[in-house]
Amino acid sequence: MRILLVEDETDLGMAIKKVLVSEKYVVDWVTDGSQAWDYLENQWTEYTLAIVDWLLPGLSGLELCQKLRTQGNSLPVLMLTALGEPENRVEGLDAGADDYLTKPFVMAELLARLRALQRRSPQFQPQILTLGNFSLDPSNNLLSVTISEPLNLERQEIALTVREFQIFQYLMQNPERIISGSKIRQQLWDLDEEPMSNVVAAQMRLIRRKLAQQNCPCPIKTVPGQGYRFTLSP
């Protein structure tokens, strides 16, 4: 899950991001409401949730929510604010926030509210992705491969790490499309991370090794000089 965090308090933003990353979220953190709107306007489909402070430079969190909803954007938003009066909460929710968390707060409550948003939103329900003989289960990071034998079907289950799962899923969602390593890094790593240029290749070696250990074919092919392609063709 990729989250857009919009928080101008440096210490708080760093603390929130650290906790979210430890929970396996991918986090893009910006400190300005106008910058956040640029991200959401141009690539909102890459995000599954936004955590937005109310008092921000540029656009306020309230204005950001209003712009989202005016455009019919249903991206779930958790509003953070030091304004804790009932009328403030009503104003935030009426502007389009899905939940409201008053500062100061403990991180456990923040995570609990994120989980609650996930339960309420159909788009967050884990959906098994299947293509050909390959199935991915987001609830447990499990890859299942069905191998056709002359007299029966054999099913192998392979446990992937979070990052391996993300790479396999991203390529599987874009079958027959060549995707560069830099594009994969841009999609799956945080904006302020600087992974080594060969990190995707290293992860691909691990994925292929796990498949080979189970005598399973790997549907991800390397296209020299261009990137990777998920294909069911031999």
UniProtKB/Swiss-Prot annotation:
Any GO MF annotation of the entry: phosphorelay response regulator activity
Gene3D superfamilies documented for this protein: 3.40.50.2300, 6.10.250.690, Winged helix-like DNA-binding domain superfamily/Winged helix DNA-binding domain
Gene disruption phenotype: Grows faster than wild-type photomixotrophically (in light with glucose), specific activity of photosystem II (PSII) is about 30% higher, most cells are single when 90% of wild-type are doublets. Increased transcription of most PSII genes under most conditions, transcription of PSI and phycobilisome-related genes are mostly decreased. A double rppA-rppB (nrsR-nrsS) deletion is less tolerant to growth on Ni(2+), no longer expresses nrsB (slr0793, involved in Ni(2+) resistance) in response to Ni(2+). Loss of expression of this operon.
Domain Response regulatory: residue ranges: 2-118
Induction details: Expression of the rrpa-rrpB (nrsR-nrsS) operon is induced 3-fold by Ni(2+) and less by Co(2+). Autoregulates its own expression.
Coiled-coil stretches: none
Protein keywords: DNA-binding, Phosphoprotein, Transcription, Transcription regulation, Two-component regulatory system
GO CC terms in record: cytosol; protein-DNA complex
Residues recorded as bearing 4-aspartylphosphate in the entry: D53
DNA-binding region extent: 126-232
GO aspect biological process, one term: regulation of DNA-templated transcription
Any Pfam family hit: Trans_reg_C
Keyword Transferase in annotation: no
Entry remark concerning the domains of this protein: The N-terminal response regulatory domain inhibits DNA-binding by the rest of the protein, in its absence the protein binds specifically to the nrsRS-nrsBACD (slr0793-slr0796) intergenic region.
Subunit record text: Interacts with histidine kinase Hik2; may accept phosphate from Hik2.
Function of the molecule: Member of two-component regulatory system RppA/RppB, involved in the establishment of the appropriate stoichiometry between the 2 photosystems. It senses changes in the plastoquinone (PQ) redox poise. Another group shows this two-component pair, renamed NrsR/NrsS, controls the nickel-dependent expression of the nrsBACD operon; they suggest the photosystem-related activities seen earlier are due to the expression of NrsS (RppB) in the absence of its natural substrate NrsR (RppA). May accept phosphate from Hik2 in a possible Hik2/RppA two-component system.
PANTHER family associated with the record: REGULATOR OF RPOS (PTHR48111), RESPONSE REGULATOR RPPA (PTHR48111:SF5)
Protein name: Response regulator RppA
Gene that encodes the chain: rppA
